[in-house]
Amino acid sequence: MKKMPRIMFVVLLSLSFLYSFPAEAAKPFKVPSSVASISKENTYPNASQDQPLLQPSELTAELFKTTSVPIENTHLIKMLNESSISGTPLAVGYRATIFLGRWALSYDSNETVANWEYKKVNTNHIDNRGGNKTVIGKYVQKQQVKVSGGLTAKVPNPEDVKTLMMQKAIQKTKLPLAFDTVIGAGTKRDQSYHVSPKKAASLHAYAPAINEKGKVTYGEVYLVLKGNKRKLVVKNVTSQGIGAWIPVQDHLTFGFQGMN
């Protein structure tokens, strides 16, 4: 059998790389069957945090194209959206540099995982040890409980960082998230739990939370005007690793534990 010429082999090998395998689709965030929404049953009306992303205006979008540093901070976008620059040609040689502040510009997510039993919020006991027929127990929230998350480290502009992280976590999990959520007293569910005679059981309820980890990017933002041209300049760009716990709003994880 004749050997394949080396040049032909290299060509064929190179051509094989032109065909790319289809990328594996991102798997949806899996929620266990033990987790249930209580948005309709909750006696405390939590305010929704799932706000639509603020879109840059025509001027803001034009300015963003002048810098290679990604900007996702909604407060900075809003400030630029509310600004206006006259279209009248400025004097030849005119130049101005306006310092807009040091901002948390963007957040890159590295890991998003859930703790479905982040905080125990309620326990209902069903004692049927003295009974001779099956009894039914249900979840009833005994008292109002506030569940809070937060950043795992101190960083500059913490509120902006929390907003950036929550936006990314909501996009990845498709869950309603908030750094503070409340389960109101008297909240109930219709689902029944059966306890046999001579038995007892406990129904535990937990508030789930998302653990978000990634990197936040900071930078000093300047608006530079020169003649009739305008651009954004970002200086002293730094990045910092950060994590956060973000509770899942109006959701509970239920655990039913039987005992003799």
Give residue ranges: language-model regions.
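Detector for methionine-enriched segments
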Residues: 1-4, 8, 79, 165-166, ...
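Deployable pore-forming modules of oligomeric membrane-permeabilizing proteins
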Residues: 26-152, 174-194, 201-202, 207-212, ...
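Generic detector of low-complexity/intrinsically disordered segments
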Residues: 11-20, 55, 205, 225, ...
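Solvent-exposed, conformationally flexible loop/turn segments
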Residues: 158, 197-200
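Membrane-insertion modules used to breach or fuse lipid bilayers
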Residues: 133-189, 228-229, 233-260
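Sec-dependent N-terminal signal peptides of Gram-positive bacterial secreted proteins and lipoproteins
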Residues: 1-28
